[in-house]
C-alpha cells in the first residue's frame, strides 16, 4: 500500500485548473470619423502575439497568451484591440526539458483557442469587419 502511494506521488501530473480572460481592451481613437468617410486604401491588419509564464508556486504556473490587433487605413488607426488569456496549470513530476516544452507549447496551445474566441467577439462588438486570429502552432 505504501509502495502504491509512493508510485502515485512520483507520477507526472498536468492539469488545467482554470482558464480566464485576464485583460481585454479596445480603442478606436479616430471614431466616429473613420466611419463617415470613404477609405482610399484597404485596411491593414497587424497582429502581435506574446506568451508569458509565471510560477505561482512550486507546482502551479500561470501561462498567458496576449494578442494585439491593430487596424490602420489611410495612415490612421481605426482600432487597437488587445486580449490576454491565461490559464493556471498544475504541473509536477516533469524534468526541466519537459517543463520548458509544457510551458512554451502545451499550455499556450490550450489557452489560445479561448483567446481567439474572445478577440473575435471583442472586435465584432466594435462593428468593424470581423478579425479572426490564425490557428497557431506553438512548436
What are these regions (language model features)?
Residues 1-110, 114-139:
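N-terminal intrinsically disordered, cationic/polar leader segments
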Amino acid at each position: 500500500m505504501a509502495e502504491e502511494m509512493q508510485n502515485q506521488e512520483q507520477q507526472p501530473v498536468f492539469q488545467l485548473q482554470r482558464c480566464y480572460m485576464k485583460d481585454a481592451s479596445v480603442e478606436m481613437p479616430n471614431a466616429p470619423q473613420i466611419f463617415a468617410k470613404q477609405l482610399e486604401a484597404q485596411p491593414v491588419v497587424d497582429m502581435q502575439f506574446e506568451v508569458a509564464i509565471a510560477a505561482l508556486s512550486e507546482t502551479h504556473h500561470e501561462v498567458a497568451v496576449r494578442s494585439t490587433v491593430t487596424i490602420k487605413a489611410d495612415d490612421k488607426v481605426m482600432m487597437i484591440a488587445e486580449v490576454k488569456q491565461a490559464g493556471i496549470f498544475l504541473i509536477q513530476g516533469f524534468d526541466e526539458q519537459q517543463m520548458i516544452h509544457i510551458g512554451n507549447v502545451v499550455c499556450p496551445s490550450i489557452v489560445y483557442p479561448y483567446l481567439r474566441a474572445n478577440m473575435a467577439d471583442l472586435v465584432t462588438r466594435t462593428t468593424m469587419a470581423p478579425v479572426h486570429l490564425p490557428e497557431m502552432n506553438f512548436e
